[in-house]
Design a protein with these regions (language model features):
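Residue-level signal for inorganic ion chemistry
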Residues: 55, 65, 96, 138, ...
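Small-residue-rich helix-loop
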Residues: 370-471
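Charged substrate- and nucleic-acid-binding regions of tRNA-handling and nucleotidyl-transfer enzymes
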Residues: 458-519
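Conserved phosphate-binding loops in nucleotide/dinucleotide-binding enzymes
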Residues: 120, 226-227, 245-257, 284-316, ...
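Single conserved hydrophobic/aromatic residue that forms the stacking wall/gate
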Residues: 1-15
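Short, often N-terminal, low-complexity regions
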Residues: 17-27, 482
Length: 520
């Protein structure tokens, strides 16, 4: 009855007043109303470290966290984790903001949007003494302790298990008396604060993707909570911040699976609710090795530099470990929000298939607004075309024929100058052409080209079509050698007359005459 009361208060008050009063209904309802939003609203976070360009794996984490929140109408929080001062890179915070804005992953809260859970930068939170306060609470509870061991002592604790060197701290500082600890603290001895892990039994944690995972407690080291420089460790700061910010779902790479039981122990020591864990599969290259900087496309910025468009990158990254029920592949960001179900994330490593990304990028380029495409393509066209061409027409030719923008120069460089080419290119089985027939056709068509005044595509094509009809030839029998002569390429972004319109009459005649000489 009480469960029903909390769902439908008016009905409950009317139908069962005794149950209402006996169970303290009004107090329960007041608490429920006050906590309704925080109890029901999904809150995810992206907490990058400002250490340089954004790795594809981090972008996927941000995207999945965003999609999980937005699919359920929840909040997506940006938090900057800059507690590792040694790895901090100047300007990296700007890269984070630029990447988030560029990909459309707009945060609801963050350093620039404080909604009452700030500060959202860990170094600022650390400066307030926040993490130390919670670490000291654990010390008072007996769940943490000061450790004064130096590098030499820690080195002596290492041992080899199954051919692998491991280090399990032996808790020697846990046995220090309170007086001894205080004396050493007063003397200013360097120290850390460690969590007091149980040494017997097991710890089980649940992950949405990987299910229940159980580890022996004896395998879990007394992890450091506060480092000797006073900064919290990544693990500890995460737990504190996620709890205080009301994070309901934690999305991260599966390399953190081994840390999850330690996280749970900290949550339990504080008596806090454990969030939903969503660990994403590893991203590998085509050789099934971890995607690294050496691959040349491990970061979002790398991909932009290589001519990939943001929408294609986001679409592709979404499919690195997740697939929709209908096997569809092209999604806008709003469509991803609608379709994304994190329960369908795979356990298996996701392969970064650059060929598939190129294909997908080509699909987005085809759909791009022609004016937007022209603006993006112009710098690539001007790399190889130095004369005054109709660049808009050339852009129209290549838009449906490229996969990335850097494909453009090699596709159009012949407009500037015919490359050296093998005369065997005139041989085409389907067009029934060879070097001899091509030479004859070019000699026959040259007077037609010389007499033609209007070199725009339609009139030019009409004149050549009339020539073809008059001679009783097939279209390709004439157009193949003509296109080869004016381009010197097997593959071109347009037909012979379209190319001739771009280069003009004078250049066309020059190239056809050169081809006749080459074939003679």
């Amino acid at each position: 009855e009480i469960a029903q009361c909390l769902v439908g208060s008016e009905m409950c008050i009317r139908d069962s007043p005794e149950a209402v009063m006996s169970q303290g209904f009004f107090l329960s309802l007041y608490i429920l109303k006050g906590r309704k939003d925080t109890m029901t609203k999904i809150r995810t976070r992206f907490a990058p470290s400002p250490t340089g360009r954004m790795h594809v794996g981090n972008l996927r984490t941000a995207l999945y966290a965003y999609l999980i929140a937005k699919h359920e109408g929840g909040d997506f929080i940006l938090r900057i984790e800059d507690t590792d001062q040694e790895r901090y890179v100047e300007g990296a915070v700007d890269i984070i903001y630029r990447t988030m804005a560029g990909t459309g992953l707009i945060h609801d809260e963050g350093p620039d949007k404080d909604k009452g859970y700030g500060p959202y930068v860990q170094s600022e939170r650390q400066a307030s003494g926040l993490y130390l306060k919670y670490a000291q609470q654990l010390i008072e509870q007996g769940d943490a302790y000061y450790c004064f061991c130096g590098p030499e002592e820690l080195e002596s604790m290492k041992r080899v298990v199954a051919g692998k060197e491991i280090s399990i701290y032996d808790k020697r500082c846990l046995r220090l008396s309170k007086e001894e600890v205080q004396r050493r603290l007063d003397a200013g001895e360097p120290h850390v604060i460690r969590f007091n892990m149980p040494t017997e039994g097991t710890t089980t944690f649940h992950d949405v993707i990987y299910g229940d995972i159980t580890v022996n407690n004896e395998e879990m080291e007394d992890l450091i909570l506060i480092k000797s420089d006073g900064y919290p460790t990544y693990n500890f700061a995460n737990v504190i911040d996620d709890h205080l910010m009301g994070i309901t779902h934690v999305v991260r790479g599966n390399e953190y699976l081994s840390s999850a039981p330690k996280y749970n122990r900290i949550y339990e020591a504080f008596g806090w609710e454990i969030p939903v864990y969503v660990h994403c599969p590893l991203i590998t290259n085509e050789e099934h090795q971890k995607l690294s900087k050496r691959s040349g496309h491990s970061s979002y910025e790398d991909l932009l530099d290589q001519g990939f468009v943001t929408e294609a990158i986001v679409n592709f990254v979404a499919l690195l470990g997740w697939s929709p029920q209908d096997n569809r592949e092209i999604f806008s960001l709003p469509e991803l929000v609608e379709a994304f179900d994190y329960h369908h994330i795979s356990k298996s490593p996701a392969v970064f298939d650059i060929t598939k990304l190129r294909w997908m990028n080509g699909e987005y380029i085809k759909k791009m607004d022609p004016e937007e495409f022209y603006e993006k393509a112009l710098p690539y066209m001007k790399e190889v075309l130095k004369r005054d061409y109709d660049f808009r027409k050339i852009a129209g030719m290549v838009q449906t024929r490229i996969e990335t923008f850097p494909d453009i120069p090699a596709l159009i460089d012949f407009f500037e100058e015919v490359p050296e080419y093998d005369s065997a290119m005139y041989c085409h089985k389907k067009m029934k052409t060879n070097e001899e027939t091509s030479l004859a056709v070019l000699k026959e068509v040259l007077p037609v080209l010389e007499a033609q005044e209007d070199y725009t595509n339609d009139p030019l094509f009409a004149s050549l079509s009339a020539f073809v009809k008059e001679k009783g030839y097939k279209n390709g029998y004439v157009m193949w050698p003509l296109r080869t002569a004016v381009s010197g390429k097997q593959m071109t972004p347009a037909g012979a007359t379209e190319i001739m319109e771009i280069i003009g009459k004078e250049e066309t005649l020059k190239r056809v005459k050169a081809a006749i000489e080459k074939l003679s």
